[in-house]
Structure formats: structure tokens, C-alpha cells
């Protein structure tokens, strides 16, 4: 069962282990999440639970979104996401999920949006080598040739060129949980996770 939760990135810091080694860690505020819908193979074609996170005013939601939550008598929630489960009968609508489903030493996958860095050139975006800086060269950071001539007479799809860098979904796999704080719903994981502090994250156990 890969039960996932939603949360926010708080920021990075460092802690010391028993041997005195410094471990770079990220602090995550995870849940509490509310189960807003349970899907089964019989009714929906697959087994999953829909999880809601982040209390919000009713004015911030559309009528269909409000109706979906009010049908289950659940308070307005900002984010909804589905997670596949093997046995949906273990869950009930309105059930609260928190970090108690995770333990220290467990490996998790964290998904979120990476930091957007705007329109970037090839050196920054793809680590391309630059051109000569001297001897009369006028090609310092230019892309160079982007294709052949008459045949095929076009730029091939997928050609690496300058453009938007970041602000895309990034998935970091097998991050190790260092500490779990059940009272504050805090996870401390080794390493970095996508995005800036406050970024919405999806956390699921690694397979």
C-alpha cells in the first residue's frame, strides 16, 4: 500500500548524527490530510483514495468543488490529490491522515514544482560549452548550428534550445526520513526537495 500525503516545504537546515557528522536536511510540514473520496474497482475501475489538504475559505472554491466536498460533509480544502491503494476498504471518508504513517529510516519519494528561473540560455539550461572568448570569435554564448540544410530543411523536434528553465514537476526518489515529529506533523528528510519554502509537495513511500 503506497499511502501518500500532501504537505509543504518549510526549509533546509543541518543536524548532527550520533557520530558527529553533519547531515543536510529539509523540514517538511506534512498533513493533516482528510480523505475526501474512496474509489473502488467496482465503481470507478481502480482502487484509490482522494486526499484533501489545506483549509481555505468557501469563496476560494468553485461551486462544483464545494459540492464535491459538501457531499461528504467535509470542510473546504485547497488541494485534492489521488493516491492508488491496494485495499480501499481500510479507509473511510473523513478519516484524518498524518505523519504517523511514516517512520524514521523509511525511504520516500517527494514530488513538487522546481524553482522557476525564467528564460535561460543553453549554458545555464543544458550546460552547453561556450565558444572561444578571444581570437576574433563572435560566438561566445550563441547556440551554434541547430540543424542541417536542405535535407531535412527544418529543425528537428526535441532540439535543445534556450527557453523556460524550472517551474516544472520534479520527483526526487528515495529520500531518507531522519526524524518524525508526530505532535507537529513534521518530517525531517535527508537531502533537498523541489521548490522554495512553502512549496506544495506530494510524499509517498518508495517502492
Swiss-Prot record:
Q: Which GO terms describe its cellular component?
A: chloroplast; cytosolic large ribosomal subunit
Q: Which InterPro entries match?
A: Ribosomal_uL3, Ribosomal_uL3_bac/org-type, Ribosomal_uL3_CS, Transl_B-barrel_sf
Which PROSITE patterns does this UniProt record tie to the protein? RIBOSOMAL_L3 (PS00474)
> Which of UniProt's keywords are assigned here?
Chloroplast, Plastid, Ribonucleoprotein, Ribosomal protein, RNA-binding, rRNA-binding
A single GO molecular function term of this UniProt record: structural constituent of ribosome
Coarsely, its chief localization is plastid
Q: Does the keyword Nucleotide-binding apply?
A: no
Record GO biological process: translation
Location in or out of the cell? Plastid, Chloroplast
Say what the protein does. Answer: One of the primary rRNA binding proteins, it binds directly near the 3'-end of the 23S rRNA, where it nucleates assembly of the 50S subunit.
Q: Which family does it belong to?
A: Belongs to the universal ribosomal protein uL3 family.
Q: What is known about its subunit structure?
A: Part of the 50S ribosomal subunit.
Q: Which HAMAP family match?
A: Ribosomal_uL3_B (MF_01325_B)
Protein name as annotated: Large ribosomal subunit protein uL3c
Name the source organism: Thalassiosira pseudonana
Phylogenetic placement of the source organism: Eukaryota, Sar, Stramenopiles, Ochrophyta, Bacillariophyta
Gene from which the chain derives: rpl3
Amino acid at each position: 500500500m503506497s499511502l501518500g500525503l500532501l504537505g509543504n516545504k518549510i526549509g533546509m537546515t543541518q543536524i548532527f548524527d550520533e557520530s558527529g557528522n553533519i547531515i543536510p536536511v529539509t523540514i517538511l510540514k506534512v498533513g493533516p490530510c482528510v480523505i475526501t473520496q474512496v474509489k473502488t474497482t467496482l465503481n470507478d475501475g481502480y482502487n484509490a483514495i482522494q486526499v484533501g489538504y489545506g483549509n481555505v475559505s468557501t469563496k476560494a472554491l468553485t461551486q462544483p468543488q464545494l459540492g464535491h466536498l459538501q457531499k461528504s460533509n467535509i470542510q473546504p480544502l485547497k488541494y485534492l490529490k489521488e493516491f492508488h491503494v491496494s485495499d480501499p476498504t481500510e479507509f473511510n471518508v473523513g478519516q484524518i491522515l498524518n505523519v504517523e504513517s511514516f517512520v524514521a529510516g523509511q525511504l520516500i519519494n517527494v514530488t513538487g514544482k522546481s524553482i522557476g528561473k525564467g528564460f535561460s540560455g543553453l549554458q545555464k539550461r543544458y550546460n552547453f560549452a561556450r565558444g572561444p572568448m578571444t581570437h576574433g570569435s563572435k560566438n561566445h554564448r550563441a547556440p551554434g548550428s541547430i540543424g542541417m540544410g536542405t535535407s531535412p530543411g527544418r529543425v528537428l523536434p526535441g532540439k535543445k534550445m534556450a527557453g523556460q528553465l524550472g517551474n516544472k514537476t520534479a520527483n526526487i526518489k528515495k529520500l531518507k526520513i531522519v526524524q518524525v515529529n508526530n505532535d507537529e506533523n513534521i518530517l525531517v528528510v535527508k537531502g533537498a526537495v523541489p521548490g522554495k519554502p512553502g512549496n506544495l509537495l506530494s510524499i509517498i513511500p518508495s517502492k
